[in-house]
Amino acid sequence: MELRAKALREMSDEELNEKLSSLKESLLRERSSVAMGGAPSSPGKMRSIRRQIARVLTVMEEKKR
């Protein structure tokens, strides 16, 4: 599920941290499956996860200001 910045800005800091950790975990799973020689379940999934992580980090930085 894609999360847009607007939805992320409405989340609390704790929710953002939870979302970030779950995204990093799913990216790790995708990378490990590819490293073991398997084909990725969806070729664009890793890119999508990386972008979602970037969105979460951006919103977290915005909230610090």
UniProtKB/Swiss-Prot annotation:
The keyword Ribonucleoprotein applies. Belongs to the universal ribosomal protein uL29 family. GO terms for biological process: translation. One of its GO terms (cellular component) is cytosolic large ribosomal subunit. The lineage of its organism: Archaea, Methanobacteriati, Thermoplasmatota, Thermoplasmata, Thermoplasmatales. Keywords: Ribonucleoprotein, Ribosomal protein. The keyword Glycosyltransferase does not apply. The gene is rpl29. This is Large ribosomal subunit protein uL29. PROSITE patterns: RIBOSOMAL_L29. Residues 30-49 are annotated as: Disordered. GO terms for molecular function: structural constituent of ribosome. It comes from Picrophilus torridus (strain ATCC 700027 / DSM 9790 / JCM 10055 / NBRC 100828 / KAW 2/3). It comes from the Archaea.
